């Protein structure tokens, strides 16, 4: 993922922001957000096996006025990466206008969608927002993807969404997000081939299947498809080595190396990280627009509507949360991409540690 960001935004301003963050963290023990993750609503129109977020009569949606106010604050503080997911974010009717506002204020804006609601009109509106990246969920070829998403034409809709975005939003990078399991390696290979033949410019990203409270499925701990034979760890390792060599796969090598350990049953794929630095460079917002350094590690905070997000982030209470979360282990044992990609690649000392560790894992 960082390769896409670097492709368009590796400039003097970006470098200065990175240098200042590292100086503040290493010498002063402080950190303000560089990335922001927004769960803009709490409903979804699919019935995915790995996620229990569903439709309901009264969905919660991040108030637009509050979101724009928060975007202003994040821009002032130097946030670079702003990602909107859900739920299913395209169920929010004024989503394009929100994305356009974010794109005017922040360098890199990213949207995650299942592609189910895509039309030519929506694709045009999204293309006009100025966002940099749209991720479409596709877990393999038609049969497997439809099974995973609980909708008989999910593949057809996602494929159509990719086509419409290519036509009507050509300046937006499209990335196919695929759940990685022991049951879909051949299906993912087939999908990658189909993408290369039809949309050669499309990228792929792999997300090891994880059960976690963020997806309302924390009580589950195994994934099993009746009548199907799972791939061995050696077969998964072979697939991952292929993915690392594929220039269209945007996962970092560090992340993919750890996925082998994850599928081998490791309960901690970050053993070299004795404390979590994630809260020092990230901020997340729930569907109500409540901020927290980490939705997994602590509950979002109710900040008064007239309060400044910037003042809150600079407050002693927020810094106390950052310090407390250093010892949090709630995401250990999982392989959530939204946490583990950044944790393995940032800050600099973690990137160096994970790089050496990844090479050692390959040798062993």
Please annotate each region the language model reported.
Residues 34-37, 259-265, 283, 312-325:
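Short, intrinsically disordered, charge-biased short linear motifs at domain edges
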Residues 6-133, 212-213, 235, 346-347, ...:
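Conserved alpha-helical substructure of the radical SAM core
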Residues 40, 44-45, 102, 176, ...:
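Generic structural signal for small/hydrophobic residues in well-ordered secondary structure
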């Amino acid at each position: 993922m960082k390769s896409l960001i670097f492709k368009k935004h590796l400039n003097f301003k970006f470098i200065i922001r990175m240098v200042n963050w590292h100086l503040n963290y290493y010498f002063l023990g402080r950190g303000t957000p560089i990335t922001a993750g927004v769960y803009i609503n709490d409903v979804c129109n699919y019935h995915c096996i790995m996620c229990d977020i569903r439709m309901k009569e009264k969905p919660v949606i991040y108030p637009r006025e509050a979101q724009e106010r928060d975007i202003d604050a994040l821009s002032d503080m130097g946030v670079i990466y702003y990602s909107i997911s859900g739920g299913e974010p395209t169920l929010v009717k004024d989503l394009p206008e929100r994305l356009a506002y974010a794109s005017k204020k922040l360098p890199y804006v990213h949207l995650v969608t299942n592609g189910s609601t895509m039309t030519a009109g929506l694709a045009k509106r999204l293309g006009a927002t100025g966002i940099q990246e749209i991720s479409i969920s596709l877990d393999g070829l038609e049969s497997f993807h439809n099974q995973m998403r609980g909708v008989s034409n999910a593949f057809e809709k996602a494929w159509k969404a990719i086509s419409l975005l290519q036509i009507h939003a050509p300046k937006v990078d499209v990335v196919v997000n695929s759940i990685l399991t022991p049951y879909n390696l051949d299906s993912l290979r087939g999908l990658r081939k189909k993408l290369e033949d039809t949309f050669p410019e499309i990228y792929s990203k792999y997300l090891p299947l994880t059960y976690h409270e963020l997806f309302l499925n924390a009580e589950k701990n195994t994934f099993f498809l009746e009548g199907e034979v799972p791939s061995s760890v050696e077969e998964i390792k072979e697939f991952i080595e292929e993915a690392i060599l594929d220039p269209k796969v945007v996962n970092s090598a560090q992340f993919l190396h750890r996925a082998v350990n994850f599928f081998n049953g490791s309960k901690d794929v970050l053993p070299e990280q004795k404390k979590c630095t994630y809260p020092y460079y990230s901020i997340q917002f729930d569907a109500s627009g409540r901020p927290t350094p980490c939705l997994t590690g602590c509950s979002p905070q109710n900040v008064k509507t007239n309060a400044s997000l910037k003042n809150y982030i600079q407050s002693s209470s927020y810094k106390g949360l950052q310090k407390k979360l250093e010892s949090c282990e709630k995401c250990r044992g999982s392989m959530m991409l939204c946490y583990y990609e950044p944790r393995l690649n940032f800050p600099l000392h973690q990137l160096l540690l994970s790089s050496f560790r990844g090479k050692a894992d390959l040798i062993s």
